[in-house]
From Swiss-Prot:
PANTHER family assigned: RNA-BINDING PROTEIN HFQ
Keyword Transcription regulation tagged: no
One term under GO cellular component: cytosol
SUPFAM superfamilies: Sm-like ribonucleoproteins
Name this protein carries in UniProt: RNA-binding protein Hfq
Bridged cysteine pairs (disulfide): none
Family: Belongs to the Hfq family.
Function of the molecule: RNA chaperone that binds small regulatory RNA (sRNAs) and mRNAs to facilitate mRNA translational regulation in response to envelope stress, environmental stress and changes in metabolite concentrations. Also binds with high specificity to tRNAs.
Lineage: Bacteria, Pseudomonadati, Spirochaetota, Spirochaetia, Leptospirales
Gene Ontology molecular functions: RNA binding
Keyword entries, A-Z: RNA-binding, Stress response
Keyword RNA-binding: yes
Subunit-structure text: Homohexamer.
Amino acid sequence: MSAKNNIQDQLLNTARKDKLDLTIYLLNGVPLKGKVVSFDNFTIVLEQENKQSLVYKHAISTIIPAKIIKLYTEEAKDNKDAAQG
């Protein structure tokens, strides 16, 4: 991964490392619930009840984590530094 990850990669990587449950809504409205096993630029591997699904990102509408994921962004860091300085 590059030095500067995008928000999508940060969210998915945090969910994967912390083994968080996600609900992924597809464009047709179908919800998929599970944990992220792996992901790349085009797909997400989701594990649900000891089964794995390969989900294409272009078919995803919304991703909702079971709990709030704190994302680190350069913009947030710059805003914090400006407030302190």
